[in-house]
Amino acid sequence: NLSKNRTQSCATCHNPEAAFIDDRDNGVSKMASLGDDLKSLGDRQAPTASYAKFSPDFHFNAKKGFYVGGQFWDGRETSLEGQAGGPPLNPIEMGMESKKEVVDRLKENSFYVESFKSIFGKDIFKNDENAYIAMTKAIASFERSDEFSTFDSKYDRYLKGEYDLTPLEDLGMSIFFSNNNNSCASCHVLKG
């Protein structure tokens, strides 16, 4: 496990059975994620990892007049690789002291060692920085898989002609896409 107390993995805060969110009962109405010590709380709730691959790099959109994109709630990482490297070293989230400590944990798992050497070369563990970067690439590659972007919601099925919206859902869609500066779709983009 890649957390200090071996109590948490990426899937703890990004549960695949709950749309890759942190669905644990944490005593604060799920407003913040629990840390590795199962007592400390992070600054905020972990965002879903679903569809994160579609988030553009964090930037100011001059046409729209506001910032868009990035990873984490505040856009502080521009890539999935950058996002994957943050939580293991965050003192509350996973609490590991250093990249070396994370890499040493990876080396405890023979499957990881064999896989890393097969994919990244037999010398991947000779340099902790390179091995850590390889880990972030592996996690990001998984986050880019179809597992994280299933496109199987009612709305997705509606777009494919496989589902008819109820009158209430149709009204909600009209409000969501209303053509004004305060529409839901201004921030929650559903079409490229």
Please report, for each region that a protein language model flagged, where it lies by residue.
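Periplasmic c-type cytochrome electron-transfer domains
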Residues: 1-192
